[in-house]
């Protein structure tokens, strides 16, 4: 159950924060995604109300109306959504039965639980995508050690074991080295009540994502394919448009994303995470990895690199307003995550004024989080003409925000 800390202030929110007649969107979640929605809401003339676990949570620091509560508690959800024009999320972990109850009570969930279940349960997602003919690896439910053994045999040991629910940034995923390790894992996790599935490992060459926005009325808009680079299971950087993508593959990915959004009834932003690999003819091909029905880490570049950011678009979509232009504003945009390290670190806030000195176009976004190893505490966005140079400068600026020192002979003036 999520930690709830009242601290100072009214735990039941601040209704006076909203101008009469202004649409109120209830956001279930208090992380950096909700934090960045708040900026977009101000520009759109919308007002947000958060359901947050703590007054000092990332989004709660910047939102005037915060209801303190637990997203697994239906009564707390009711407090947060009372009077809201629409209800949306910055994570997929709200119990589906609670979301269904909200709809039955007359609230406007966007996306709706029938769509969101495909981002909550990986087996449900795989089964539905297979029905749609989307490219997915072989998969199977794993309910016993025998199931695990059978799948190991079927795939010649190319097994990725996953928790069906939860898990992100590399958590809830296991790559057993042998059959006995797999069956031991399954036995242990099953005893602990973890529902499991297995997939055949994909020999991928890089990771891509396509972001799609869809309104309840059915309008759809997509951004160009993005390449993401993972380090230790965590997204370290994203580059858009993804370099070296064949135009036909770009079109196929966009069509795939739009089909998934439409057929699943997704509203708001949908991120379709993709594995890229070489097919039998040697051409780059794609398979679906996972889905996220909310703004996504690989879409943060849109804050500076697109006419319409993913955060603005998400709020437009859940309100069933016309979608914005998704055209790019530069030949290349790079997002570099600011990740906490495990060594002595300087205060990242003190580093902000100097982080963009060598490249003034650097845009810093910090999340108001404490530093922990590997934790996403912010990101840097940078647009440019040259992919290699833009990647280098974005990485160095992100590194400086953690370590307060320039690496690779890059120095502030």
From Swiss-Prot:
Entry GO MF terms: 5-(carboxyamino)imidazole ribonucleotide synthase activity; ATP binding; metal ion binding; phosphoribosylaminoimidazole carboxylase activity
Domain of life (superkingdom): Bacteria
Annotated residues for binding of ATP: 122, 162, 199-202, 207, 289-290
UniProt keyword list: ATP-binding, Ligase, Nucleotide-binding, Purine biosynthesis
Residues in ATP-grasp domain copies: 126-319
SUPFAM superfamilies xrefs: Glutathione synthetase ATP-binding domain-like, PreATP-grasp domain, Rudiment single hybrid motif
EC numbers on record: 6.3.4.18
Functional description taken from the UniProt entry: Catalyzes the ATP-dependent conversion of 5-aminoimidazole ribonucleotide (AIR) and HCO(3)(-) to N5-carboxyaminoimidazole ribonucleotide (N5-CAIR).
Annotated HAMAP family: PurK (MF_01928)
Complex and partners: Homodimer.
Family listed: Belongs to the PurK/PurT family.
Protein name per Swiss-Prot or TrEMBL: N5-carboxyaminoimidazole ribonucleotide synthase
Taxonomic source organism: Corynebacterium ammoniagenes (Brevibacterium ammoniagenes)
């Amino acid at each position: 159950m999520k930690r709830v800390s009242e601290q100072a202030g009214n735990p039941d929110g601040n209704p006076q924060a909203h101008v009469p007649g202004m649409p109120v969107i209830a956001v279930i979640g208090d992380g950096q995604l909700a934090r960045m929605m708040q900026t977009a809401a101000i520009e759109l003339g919308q007002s947000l109300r958060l359901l947050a676990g703590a007054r000092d949570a990332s989004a709660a620091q910047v939102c005037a109306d915060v209801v303190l509560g637990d997203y697994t508690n239906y009564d707390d959800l009711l407090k947060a959504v009372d009077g809201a024009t629409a209800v949306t999320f910055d994570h997929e972990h709200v119990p589906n039965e609670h979301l269904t109850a909200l709809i039955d009570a007359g609230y406007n969930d966007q996306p709706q639980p029938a769509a969101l279940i495909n981002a909550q349960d990986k087996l449900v997602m795989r089964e539905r995508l297979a029905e749609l003919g989307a490219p997915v690896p072989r998969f199977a439910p794993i309910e016993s050690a025998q199931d695990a053994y059978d799948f190991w045999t079927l795939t010649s040991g190319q097994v990725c074991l996953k928790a069906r629910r939860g898990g992100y940034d590399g958590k809830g995923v296991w790559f057993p080295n042998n059959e006995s390790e797999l069956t031991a894992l399954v036995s242990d996790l099953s005893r602990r009540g973890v529902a499991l599935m297995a997939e055949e490992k994909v020999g991928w060459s890089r990771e891509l994502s396509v972001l799609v926005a869809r309104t309840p009325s059915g309008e759809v808009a997509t951004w160009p394919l993005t390449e993401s680079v993972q380090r230790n299971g965590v997204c370290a950087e994203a580059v858009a448009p993804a370099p070296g993508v064949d135009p036909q593959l770009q079109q196929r990915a966009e069509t795939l994303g739009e089909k998934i959004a439409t057929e699943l009834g997704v509203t708001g932003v949908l991120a379709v995470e993709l594995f890229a690999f070489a097919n039998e003819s040697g051409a780059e091909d794609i398979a679906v990895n996972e889905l996220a029905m909310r703004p996504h880490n690989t879409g943060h570049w849109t804050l500076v690199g697109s006419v319409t950011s993913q955060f603005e678009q998400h709020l437009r979509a859940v309100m069933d307003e016309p979608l914005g232009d998704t055209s790019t504003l530069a030949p290349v945009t790079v997002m570099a995550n600011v990740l906490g390290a495990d060594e002595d670190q300087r205060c990242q806030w003190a580093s902000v004024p100097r982080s963009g000195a060598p490249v003034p176009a650097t845009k810093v976004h910090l999340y108001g989080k404490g530093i922990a190893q590997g934790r996403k505490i912010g990101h840097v966005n940078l647009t440019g003409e040259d992919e290699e140079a833009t990647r280098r400068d974005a990485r160095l600026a992100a590194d400086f925000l953690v370590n307060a020192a320039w690496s690779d002979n890059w120095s502030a003036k």
